[in-house]
Amino acid sequence: MTAGGRASLDDIRAFHAKMMAAASNSTDERLEQAFRLVRREAFMGPGPWQIVLNRRYLETPSDDPAFLYQNVLVSLDRSKGINNGEPFLHAAFIGAVAPKPGETAIQIGTGTGYYTALLSTLVAPGGHVHAVEIDEALANRTRENLASFEGISVIHGDATSAELPAADLIYVNAGVVAPPVSWLQALRPEGRIIVPWQASDRIGLAILIIRTEHGYSARALMPAYFIPCIGASDPDQCSKVPTVAGARSIRSVWLTQDRSPDETAVAIYRDLWFSNADVSQG
């Protein structure tokens, strides 16, 4: 508290961290610590900031970082519609993929590095984050913002065509019509990928895919809409568009080269398809 009895920025940040930990639905106590230690304002550029709500841009009254510790989008590049995502949604993403010390993570779409920093904190000690950003200006900002962090490689490039290293988790911050096969193939055994699946104008779901001994399990988690991922947003690759109910029913995803679509298919793409049958039934 300040001398006047008002909450200090440290108090506000600490309470925000508690809310983030609760939003993650995780029992990992490290999450609250990470959310408290990584300062959001260090990645947003100088204030005042533009808060995005219902497609409107609202400028904060001042450059007081307290305005950033809310569940709000913060504009990073208004001309391109690129924002720093809603903290509670990302907390849920992080809780779902459950980063562990020593793991290798790939982040696709870094923005300016805030969630990259959180991931790097959670895979420490001994872990590494490969942060891939297709926008050169954002990649440069990410690199500058993360200069004091260890275990991070910032790569300016197209993650849909680049060769990716083997990874324990892949954290995607752009919407895809279907995830590229290369992303699934980069997963180590028990590796996890969370990705915003924007299968149609009516469907935007965060899905969690896990590489198991039987194949790739998949499940829908929550609504999620992100800026489209360049290179993975072509609707023409789809030969069967899922219904809303079908998209929510997914239980596995198969590479077409390994198995042809069958009667359990709810969505079919050029290189992979989603099934409503458990992966162990394949």
Question: Which functions belong to the PLM regions below?
Answer:
Residues 77-80, 144-169, 239-260:
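Generic structural signal for short, solvent-exposed loop/turn connectors between secondary structure elements
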Residues 85-203, 208-212:
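Conserved nucleotide-cofactor-binding alpha/beta core module
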